[in-house]
Every structure is written in structure tokens, then in C-alpha cells.
Regions:
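A short, well-structured alpha-helix characteristic of acyl/acetyltransferase catalytic modules
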Residues: 6-59
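Acetyl-CoA-dependent GNAT
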Residues: 19, 58-118, 129, 135, ...
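Conserved GNAT acetyl-CoA-binding A-motif
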Residues: 108, 136-150
């Protein structure tokens, strides 16, 4: 199979799953997505507008989103990262990724997930978590032995989701994130594979 013809490392095919009565397509990030940066920008910027507990707090420009997509596809091509997209009616409603940390931490994959507000609490986040971990084991070289994540200590629904999927809290660093004018802690969690 030629992995460069628009479908980079396509061992994960698109799947349609039903969550709370909504047909959601789960698929890998594709080269053709470079032509659609606006739909990804709208998704990310919706989280900023919502004031979600995510690390970034500034809306992205179209140029910044294009650069992000290009860099992510480059990581996928090098087998250094995996990235999946959840879409409902062609609107991005969630993403999940794992990227190898590199060098002496090449056995560690950094996990990230974002889900649009109206799609939380319906099982989508858990499904994306399972799928991205499975995909990381198939595609990343070297295969990660540890998945690491960082989350706002105040984001209890996310922490509970991660615990449900086997992540263990290993550290809480106080005053690492600024949220709503206050400093809040950062919780570090690991999943040993």
C-alpha cells in the first residue's frame, strides 16, 4: 500500500459510530485536510470562545492552523505522531493525538484530546482515547511504552475519564495554569503499556 497518496498511514479506516443518537465519523487526519484549515480552526476557536480548560487561550488564525496541520501531518509521515478526528455532519467535534516526546524520552507518547462542548459526556472522549492509544501502538516507531498527559487539576470530568482508561496520577504541580483569573494546578497522569 502506498502510504503517501493522501491517506498517510491509513491502517485506521474511517468508522461511523453512534453517540447519543448522533452519527459521528472517526477518522485519521489526512493530507486533504490541508485544504480545509477553516473547519479545524473553527473547532479550536470554539474551545477558546467557550473558555474550556485547555492549555491554549488565544484564537488561531487561518495561517496558524495551516502550520499546525502541516506539522502534524509531517509527524504522522515520520511515524512520530498519530492524530484522529471526530466529525458530525462534516463539522469537527473532537480530536485526539499522541506524539512521541523524542530523544531519551522516545518511549513516551504525549496524549492530547479536545471535544466540543455539546459532544462531551456521551462516550466520545472515551472512544477517542481508546482508538488513539490503539493507533499509537500500531503506527508509532518506536512503539510508546508510556502515554503521558497533562490536565487542569480542576477538570474533574477529564481526570475521571483518564482514570477509567487506566491512567494514574503521578504528580500535581500547583499554580501551573491560569484559568478565569486564578492560578490552578496541573495534574500529570501516565498510562503504562
Amino acid at each position: 500500500m502506498d502510504l503517501q497518496k493522501g491517506n498517510l498511514f491509513l491502517t485506521m479506516l474511517a468508522k461511523i459510530k453512534i453517540f447519543n443518537g448522533k452519527k459521528i465519523t472517526i477518522r485519521p487526519l489526512l493530507k486533504k485536510d490541508l485544504k480545509l484549515p477553516e473547519k479545524f480552526r473553527k473547532f479550536i476557536n470554539s474551545l477558546i470562545t467557550e473558555n474550556a480548560q485547555v492549555a491554549f487561550n488565544k484564537k488561531l488564525s487561518l495561517k496558524e492552523e495551516r502550520i499546525f496541520l502541516k506539522n502534524t501531518l509531517s509527524q504522522i509521515k515520520k511515524r512520530f505522531g498519530v492524530f484522529i478526528v471526530a466529525e458530525h455532519n462534516k463539522i469537527v467535534v473532537g480530536t485526539a493525538s499522541i506524539t512521541l516526546k523524542g530523544n531519551r524520552q522516545n518511549h513516551v507518547g504525549e496524549y492530547g484530546i479536545t471535544v466540543r462542548k455539546d459532544y462531551r459526556g456521551i462516550g466520545l472522549g472515551g472512544y477517542l482515547t481508546e482508538e488513539i492509544i490503539k493507533l499509537s501502538q500500531k503506527q508509532l516507531k518506536p512503539t510508546p511504552k508510556i502515554i503521558r498527559l497533562s490536565v487542569f487539576s480542576t477538570n474533574k470530568p477529564a481526570i475521571n475519564l483518564y482514570k477509567k482508561h487506566g491512567f494514574k496520577k503521578v504528580a500535581e504541580i500547583p499554580n501551573q495554569m491560569e484559568y478565569n483569573g486564578k492560578l490552578v494546578g496541573e495534574t500529570i497522569m501516565l498510562l503504562q503499556l
